[in-house]
A protein has these predicted regions:
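Structural signature for solvent-exposed beta-strand/loop edge elements and short helix-capping sites
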Residues: 1-217
Length: 217
């Protein structure tokens, strides 16, 4: 059977630029909304993405969508086609800016990033999702660390974070978390399961200062 998909765009104003009778750019301003369908190289549906923001800019190359950029209260929801993609749950995300690189299958979120997947929430300054590998990379800034929160668990914060969306495992660099009345800090924290972590070069302390006065190593 043949599957037909129709991408949708809505907004208060839509500007379209053509070059040599080919679509070059589309700019959506004011309450921008877009729905686009994701297909593999055999044209099978892998899922669809809903996105909203103050402005949405779409850039085309050779008549095909190349990049999609959303600015201002950018939000998105990815709905996977169950059975055709390894992503097995809806993924919600929001940030100040979202940039989609269609051909490279990369999504990058900038500033005030929050992502919800299964029972896990990630907060960070910058996040890149590589859909080729289904890996997520979070990078903190100087003022605020990346933070991952699993349902029923204490938050874990760190400078950089790598997370596999398929097996739910991850690595947190320069991480820290609360356990009971104390705190663990570690150069690297490996997340094996939502409640199982392995730490490398770690310390334990009940002192809540950034540089604890005492600790066990």
């Amino acid at each position: 059977s043949i599957q037909l998909f129709k991408d949708e765009m809505h907004g208060n104003r839509i500007d379209i630029d053509l070059e040599n009778n080919m679509l070059e750019t589309i700019s959506i301003k004011g309450m921008g909304k877009s729905i686009y369908y994701i297909v593999d190289k055999t044209n099978l549906l892998m899922g669809y993405n809903k996105a909203t923001g103050d402005t949405i800019n779409l850039n085309y190359k050779g008549g095909n969508l190349n990049t999609l950029n959303i600015k201002g209260d950018a939000r998105g929801i990815f709905y996977p086609e169950i059975g055709r993609t390894k992503i097995d749950s809806i993924l919600n995300y929001k940030s100040s800016i979202i940039n989609y690189e269609i051909n490279e299958e990369l999504t990058t979120l900038y500033e005030n990033v929050e992502i919800e997947y299964h029972n896990t929430t990630l907060k960070s300054n910058n996040v890149t999702i590589d859909w080729n590998t289904n890996n997520l990379y979070a990078y903190a800034d100087e003022k605020e660390e990346s933070e991952i929160i699993s349902q029923g668990q204490k938050p874990i914060a760190g400078r950089n974070l790598e997370f596999d969306l398929i097996n739910k495992k991850g690595i947190i660099k320069l991480g820290k978390t609360a356990v009971g009345d104390g705190f663990y800090k570690s150069n690297i924290i490996y997340r094996e399961e939502p409640n199982i972590y392995h730490m490398n070069k770690s310390i334990y302390t009940t002192c809540d200062h950034e540089n604890p006065h005492y600790y066990f190593k």
